[in-house]
């Protein structure tokens, strides 16, 4: 069985948190995109759709969470919060797709431009 490992290092003010997750994953290719499909610990389906310039992570929560990353460009995240659906700006500073690995570094900020946290996400599978 193929496994996916998602290791996210989050810098929030002076706090550093590392989230390390391992799931069974299914890999599919369709057109120019590759897809990683798995279920998280909440039993929500998660789909990561990616190619060289773009990655979209959709979590089928209720309502669903959508994060879009663009190489060298800002993009949007739609994240459900206790205050309802919130739109965040994602500033991606590093995005690299390897053979069985994706590296992402990004900042999340609200629409007013107030930074929320810094993230370094490493996704590996195989």
Model-derived regions, located:
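Flexible glycine-rich active-site/ligand-binding loops centered on an Asp-His dyad
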Residues: 118-126
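N-terminal intrinsically disordered, cationic/polar leader segments
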Residues: 1-65, 72-74, 78-110, 114-116
